[in-house]
């Protein structure tokens, strides 16, 4: 994960001080890209311990289309707690956009704690998988979480806004565009999450996982994360672990947490830091 360390150093050396929505203040660098070949191993940051349960369960939650944090809390994941309302709802965030993009406004009716929508919307993930199978040379395999009509109703507009899949010579690649990138807390999770998504997509469509390409808009380090970043940069990245899927899964929506096994992850101790809300 030297790429990640190099990105942190670039921001510290070349970034500019900026104010931000949270009032915390950042050093920001606009426009950055990192590439992680999955043939090198599964890209988990090793210079601090990551909470793997949060990464895996959050992605399964996105793919389910759910936007209430109940599932996350039931599985020991608290990373969305600060943004949820008193009922645990977040509005039409990632899962809704991935699975029901442009569904009409919610009604007053509620089923199983979830607001009912007037229209079904576009299931972008299912459409993408269908396209991988029918037109693997397509350059139109895109899923967008950024829906301007829904942004005002979201608890937090999507930071990782759009992702694209490309199949080349039997290998599947995935590129993420992230408009806003919290380099210390958020980005290590995002790298792992979308690399996991690439592995899952490749598994259910019969391709070899290729590269995860991470394109960042505003890449920033919060002012109250400086000590933590400097500590992390004193540590040396270790060899990457491997990710094993323990059973044959035919649908991406059928994966379970127990299907994933990370082998050889030997990180340095966790480094705590406050979340800017």
Swiss-Prot record:
Keywords: Cytoplasm, Methyltransferase, Nucleotide biosynthesis, Transferase. InterPro entries: Thymidate_synth/dCMP_Mease, Thymidate_synth/dCMP_Mease_dom, Thymidate_synth/dCMP_Mease_sf, Thymidylate_synthase. The keyword Transferase applies. It holds the Pfam family Thymidylat_synt. It comes from the Bacteria. It catalyses: dUMP + (6R)-5,10-methylene-5,6,7,8-tetrahydrofolate = 7,8-dihydrofolate + dTMP. Pathway: Pyrimidine metabolism; dTTP biosynthesis. (6R)-5,10-methylene-5,6,7,8-tetrahydrofolate binds at residues 51, 182, 276. Its EC number is 2.1.1.45. Gene3D superfamilies: Thymidylate synthase/dCMP hydroxymethylase domain (3.30.572.10). DUMP binds at residues 21, 139-140, 179-182, 190, 220-222. GO terms for biological process: dTMP biosynthetic process; dTTP biosynthetic process; methylation. One of its GO terms (cellular component) is cytosol. The active site is at 159 (nucleophile). One of its GO terms (molecular function) is thymidylate synthase activity. It is found in: Cytoplasm. Belongs to the thymidylate synthase family. Bacterial-type ThyA subfamily. Homodimer. Catalyzes the reductive methylation of 2'-deoxyuridine-5'-monophosphate (dUMP) to 2'-deoxythymidine-5'-monophosphate (dTMP) while utilizing 5,10-methylenetetrahydrofolate (mTHF) as the methyl donor and reductant in the reaction, yielding dihydrofolate (DHF) as a by-product. This enzymatic reaction provides an intracellular de novo source of dTMP, an essential precursor for DNA biosynthesis. This is Thymidylate synthase.
């Amino acid at each position: 994960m030297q790429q990640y360390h190099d990105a942190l150093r670039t921001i510290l050396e070349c970034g500019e001080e900026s104010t931000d929505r949270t009032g915390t203040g950042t050093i920001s660098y606009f426009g950055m890209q990192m590439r992680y070949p999955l043939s090198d191993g599964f890209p988990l940051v090793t210079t601090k311990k990551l909470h793997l349960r949060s990464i895996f369960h959050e992605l399964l939650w996105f793919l389910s289309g759910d936007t209430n944090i109940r599932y996350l809390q039931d599985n020991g994941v608290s990373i969305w707690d600060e943004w949820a309302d008193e009922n645990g709802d977040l509005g039409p965030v990632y899962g809704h956009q991935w699975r029901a993009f442009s569904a009409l406004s919610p009604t007053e009716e509620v089923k199983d704690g979830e607001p009912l929508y007037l229209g079904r919307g576009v299931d972008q993930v299912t459409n993408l998988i269908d396209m991988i199978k029918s037109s693997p040379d397509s350059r139109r395999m895109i899923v967008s979480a950024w829906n301007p009509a829904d942004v005002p109703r979201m608890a937090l507009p999507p930071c990782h806004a759009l992702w694209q899949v490309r199949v080349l010579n039997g290998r599947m690649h995935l590129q993420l565009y992230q408009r806003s990138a919290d380099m210390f807390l958020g980005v290590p999770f995002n790298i792992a999450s979308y690399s996991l998504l690439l592995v899952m997509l490749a598994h259910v469509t019969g391709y070899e996982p290729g590269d995860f390409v991470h394109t960042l808009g505003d890449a920033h380090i919060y002012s109250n994360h400086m000590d933590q970043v400097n500590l992390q940069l004193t540590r040396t990245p270790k060899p990457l672990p491997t990710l094993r899927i323990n059973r044959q899964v035919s649908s991406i929506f059928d994966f379970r947490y127990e299907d994933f096994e990370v082998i050889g992850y030997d990180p340095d101790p966790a480094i705590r830091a406050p979340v800017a809300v």
